[in-house]
Regions:
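Amphipathic, small/basic residue-rich leader segments at the start of a protein or domain
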Residues: 7-120, 131, 136-151
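Generic alpha-helical propensity signal that fires on short helical segments
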Residues: 42, 61, 98-101, 112, ...
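Glycine-rich, Trp-frequent "lid" loop and neighboring beta-strands that shape
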Residues: 92, 132, 136-189
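Well-ordered alpha-helical segments within folded domains of soluble proteins
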Residues: 121-127
Length: 189
């Protein structure tokens, strides 16, 4: 067994295999701790009175929505809003590893990703708009999603391919004058 250190990582060689130390850097652990604390001490207690939403009396739904919106406001105040988006869009500017930590903690309650505004499909659609959207699309749609005032969706499932794998999508659009012609077949919409 040989232990080596490279760029702050510990790499151990055992019996012909390489082992990487996946211990989190202190700054990553600090983010995870903040999110875990928020989930355990803010989100869970706020949601507890409502039980499971499918069993919630209709008379409580308004209070439930108010509680969710207040949780979002608190997430913004505590700097836990939009973990996946750049700071210029009001986000935390986290990378993939840090986002995975946030999502792992947020998923410990059914509303966690929504409270932090990093829920599907919005999280992926925000990235798509950020990287490939026009300035007009960013202004109209991305800012709305980042503010938490809008939701997004997409139609992906096609009968010709197995499931909902976006790499196998066959539907395409062709511009015809001022209009677009969509060629393909979607289902489960």
């Amino acid at each position: 067994s040989v232990t080596a250190h490279h760029n702050g990582d510990t790499i151990e060689r055992h019996w012909g295999t390489t082992m990487i130390d996946f211990t989190l850097a202190p700054e990553h652990e600090a983010i995870r701790s903040r999110v875990r604390d928020f989930v355990d001490n803010v989100i869970k207690p706020a949601m507890e009175p409502f039980g499971h939403r499918d069993e919630m009396p209709e008379s409580e739904r308004g209070n439930y929505i108010k509680a969710l919106l207040n949780l979002r406001k608190e997430a913004v105040k505590q700097g836990l809003w939009l973990p996946h988006m750049p700071k210029e869009y009001g986000g935390m500017g986290l990378g993939h590893v840090e986002l995975a930590m946030v999502q792992s903690e947020a998923a410990k309650t059914r509303v966690g990703p929504w409270v932090f505004n990093c829920q599907a499909p919005d999280e992926g659609n925000m990235h798509t708009l950020l990287h490939w959207g026009t300035d007009a699309q960013k202004e109209k749609y991305l800012k709305l999603l980042c503010s938490g005032r809008g939701r997004s969706c997409f139609a992906m499932t096609e009968p010709e391919v197995a499931g909902s794998d976006p790499t196998l999508i066959r539907t395409y659009g062709v511009q015809d004058g001022d209009e677009w012609v969509i060629n393909g077949h979607k289902w489960f919409i």
